[in-house]
Amino acid sequence: MRPSITPRAGWLLAALLTVALTGWAPAVQHPTAVTPTPTSSAVTKAPARHFVSRPDLTPPVITATTADAGLALAPAAESADVFLGPKDLDTGVAMQGELIVDAHGQPVWVDGSSTGTFDFREQTYQGRPVLTYWAGASSSYGHGDVVVLDQTYTRVATVTTGGDLGAHQADMHETTITPQGTMLLTSYPEVRADLSSTGGPKDGWVLEGVAQEVDIATGRVLFEWRSLDHVPISDTFQPLSPGQGTQANPFDYLHMNSVSQDGPDHLLISARNTHTVYEVARGTGAVTWQLGGRHSSFTFGPGAAFAWQHDARRQADGTLTLFDNEAPPTSSRGLRLSLDTSTMTATLVVQYLPPAARAAATQGDVQVLPDGNVMVGWGQEPYYSEYTAGGQLLSDATFTAGSSYRAFVAPWTGTPTAPPDAVLRRSGSAGTVYVSWNGATQVASWRVLTGSDASDAAPAATVPRAGFETAIPVKHPGSYVEVQALDAAGTVLRSVVVG
């Protein structure tokens, strides 16, 4: 059971759907990921929420697809939140930017000012919870920085690349903070290379995959790994398209999409376009083994092979998790493997399948939660799901359109510096106050005070918080109306005078 951080009502129990362990079969080759840009104002918008107190915010409606409609996370996750980065306006998604929703899909914090967010999540930095996300210019790769926010949603750090790469060259695929106060970053510099092994020009251009470990406090680069020193271009499975391989259109032979710690001495690097997870020695950068691809160090057992994968992570029990974009022919999956380095075999432990076929050509992640459950974000497909460790589907939810590079679950406590927002709509002698507080997680109820002025204002109504925005009927609102946010103990957290 995760720790409770905010009063949230209970909902219906999601039906358990058993996920069968089936074999793997290869599917068609997927294209390189591209983040679309808006192309038409005539795109039909997906369902969005609208608020009287915050008309500028239009987060997507989260809909449960599991049997007991209304539940977006399993009961054990009632007090945790989901972190999403909806994007791709040309698909009709309701907003782009950072989005936190609760276990039922109700908005907690909405930042719709972004042009597209990647890898938005809760992490720990210097012993405190923070929010992190990548911001910059992107297509299938990006140039930008990683933003770090504290619990008041104030920027406390900006992390970027260094060394020969220079600043602002961080790609959007990885933003992990380590326990040592460093961040693991990826970058895609354009480099001259011989592409004759792929049918391209001898004097061509590629996107090299670079991993950096950067000290957040100082910006110092502590470790760097460059793919062309270790992975030949001929290892790619990505076809060279006509016109690719030039400086204007370099060939993405590797497509590095995750970097994670593998004990104190190694890193795991996932490369989509070589179908490989590499274990890399921190000291030398040497590849100690390869999982998958043309030169796999491991033999795969039934159902264990993968392709075009994302988000490879070593778990506390020694297993390796990843998002297999090309699992069975019609569906992607979350994957958990056991690696035996004495026999060099990779064995399927469990796979996490959607309730119906769901092929995510790009993006996606697998997160093992503290209670052992598993969260799967479906990348290009606008869904997220929670499973038991053994593969039983507990909940599945959709935000209808667009995509979210990854999806995460974590407890979060937010205390915004900005005050609540409130609007009074009068109807004759009565009225209704609409109030919200974007990002505040400790509000249990709202109290309305009214009178001729502040000196004689008296309580007129107290109601429980009812989602992101609460509507409060007031029988006889005076010329002065104040709304107070109360925590579970009845303490006033903040107040706002309705204009």
Feature-to-residue mapping (PLM):
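Intrinsic disorder/low-complexity segments
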Residues: 1-3, 37-38
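Secretory targeting and sorting signals
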Residues: 2-29
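Histidine-/acidic-rich catalytic cores in large beta-rich domains
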Residues: 30, 34-499
